């Protein structure tokens, strides 16, 4: 992998589970963990990666198809987990198990954080969850935007998608 690139791999999508892997030379990030820990490990193996190498999990919202394996992975591998305050409270009510305080981090909507060699912007979306958010990943003038589980695409989100070099947009309805 070159210093100016990043890899995006969709591990799972849909009501049975969601997980997306994003890798840069310095960071290995999982967005959502809606499969069991074993299933995430198997999906990572399929793309030639190890679940043990993931250093960060970003959570979009607390629905089980986005957080099913988060507690297991956090306890087994010690990964840092980022979510906004309302999502953390909602996840804890869903009994994700004990996660060490030093692994829990806040990432509120509208904030940009730098993770090694990649900047990540969080943004609010419309969905039936405590405080759903999704992410835009920016590295070396390139931008990838993730947008799933949203009921409405605002003008701000539309502009973000329009200006992205690539984006992932999930569309499904039961």
Describe the role of every protein-language-model region:
Residues 1-47, 133-149:
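Conserved beta-strand hairpin/beta-sheet module of binuclear metal-dependent hydrolase folds
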Residues 119-174:
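Active-site-proximal loop/helix segment associated with metal-binding centers of metalloenzymes
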Residues 85-134, 138-141:
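Metallo-beta-lactamase
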Residues 9-19, 56-70, 74-75, 88-92, ...:
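Structured catalytic core of nucleotide-sugar glycosyltransferases
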Residues 44-48, 113-117, 157-160:
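Short amphipathic alpha-helix with an adjacent loop that forms part of the alpha/beta core around
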Residues 54, 101, 164-165:
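Short, well-ordered alpha-helix to beta-strand connector turns
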Residues 31-34, 54-62, 82-85, 145-149, ...:
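Active-site neighborhood of phospho(di)ester-bond hydrolases with catalytic His/Asp-centered motifs
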Residues 38-83:
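Active-site metal-binding motif and surrounding structural segment of the metallo-beta-lactamase
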């Amino acid at each position: 992998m070159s210093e100016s690139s990043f890899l995006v791999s969709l591990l799972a999508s849909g009501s049975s589970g969601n997980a997306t892997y994003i890798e840069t030379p310095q960071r290995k990030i999982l967005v959502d963990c809606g499969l069991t820990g074993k299933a995430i490990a198997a999906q990572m193996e399929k793309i030639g990666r190890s679940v043990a190498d993931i250093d960060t999990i970003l959570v979009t919202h607390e629905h089980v198809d986005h957080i099913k394996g988060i507690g297991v992975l956090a306890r087994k591998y010690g990964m840092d987990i980022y979510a906004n305050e309302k999502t953390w409270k909602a996840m804890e009510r869903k009994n994700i198990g004990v996660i060490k305080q030093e692994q829990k981090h806040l990432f509120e909507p509208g904030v940009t954080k730098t993770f090694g060699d990649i900047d990540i912007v969080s943004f609010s979306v419309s969905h039936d969850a405590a405080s759903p958010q999704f992410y835009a990943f920016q590295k070396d003038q390139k931008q990838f935007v993730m947008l799933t589980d949203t009921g409405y695409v605002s003008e701000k989100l539309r502009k973000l998608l329009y200006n992205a070099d690539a984006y992932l947009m999930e569309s499904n309805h039961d």
